[in-house]
UniProtKB/Swiss-Prot annotation:
Protein name as it appears in the record: Ribosome maturation factor RimP
InterPro entries cross-referenced by the UniProt entry: Ribosome_maturation_RimP (IPR003728), RimP_C (IPR028998), RimP_C_sf (IPR036847), RimP_N (IPR028989), RimP_N_sf (IPR035956)
Purpose of the protein: Required for maturation of 30S ribosomal subunits.
Gene name per UniProt: rimP
GO biological process per UniProt: ribosomal small subunit assembly; translation
Chain residue ranges for the region called Disordered: 189-260
Length: 260
């Protein structure tokens, strides 16, 4: 199995702080896991501890580009398991689970809100903003530490365009992407690019030519592709169609000796 490559050029990206902080035992696990992940070139996304069917400690991680392959999960598990055994943050038996953020992933860093501009999100505020705590809409990026979304659940006034909301980044309690066809297609493309890059780094595939690498970078910066709208079929039962059909019927039923 191919070993995932270390990403030395992304050390700054891995050090970007998260906007969420887990409470209690999850916070202790995060304090142990985060340095190990950063040392391998990954970023911590979220810690979740559940007691169903025994205790499970789920550590959600990612590469700085937002992807996470199976080989990456295995590498993190192999490096983190002995560290967790020594630190022993949980005073009972547990199962360690390393996973990717998933397609409808949580947004936990400022760069997440920038990377997924153009996608549908759900946001919950720590305190009410403009009389409400929950928002849903299309992410429009960040400006002056305010997350901008175009809401799809409200209108500024009847007959107008959907209302915009500007939410303070520091007041966001949780945020995650909403599963759409557009998001699925984008995630699959990112996954294919990550797998190809892994094989290129391992020497299994030849490196891409400079123009192909540049095109890939420009495509990532461009954000999600706009869905193509199918052209509506032309109507086939208009007045012109009916008149033409009627004239054709009159020609076929007319007397062939007429005019002689």
């Amino acid at each position: 199995m191919t070993e995932p490559a270390f990403f030395p050029e992304t050390a700054t990206s891995t050090a970007e702080p998260r906007l969420v902080v887990e409470p209690g035992v999850a916070a202790r696990v995060a304090a142990i896991a985060e340095p190990v992940l950063e040392g391998l070139g990954y970023r911590l996304v979220r810690i979740k501890i559940s007691g169903e069917a025994g205790c499970t400690v789920q550590i959600m991680a990612e590469r700085p580009d937002g992807t996470m392959l199976i080989d990456d999960c295995e590498a993190v598990s192999k490096a983190l398991s002995p560290v967790m055994d020594v630190a022993d943050p949980i005073q009972r038996a547990y199962r360690l689970e390393i996973s990717s953020p998933g397609i409808d992933r949580p947004l936990v860093r400022q760069s997440d809100f920038e990377r997924y501009t153009g996608h549908l999100v759900k946001i919950e505020m720590a305190a009410p903003h403009e009389g409400r705590k929950r928002f849903r809409g299309t992410l429009q990026g960040i400006e002056d530490n305010l997350v901008r979304i175009t809401r799809d659940d409200a209108k500024s006034h009847e007959g107008a365009q959907p209302a915009d909301a500007r939410l303070p980044l520091a007041d966001i309690a949780s945020a995650h992407l909403v599963l759409t066809d557009q998001l699925i297609a984008e995630s699959m493309r990112r996954g294919r690019d990550a797998e190809r890059e892994q094989l290129e780094n391992a020497g299994v595939l030849p490196p891409p030519p400079p123009h192909a690498k540049k095109a890939r970078e420009m495509r990532d910066k461009a954000g999600p592709r706009k869905e193509k709208t199918a052209k509506k079929p032309l109507p086939k039962n208009t007045k012109a169609h009916r008149l033409a059909a009627d004239a054709k019927r009159r020609q076929t039923t007319s007397d062939p000796h007429q005019g002689e």
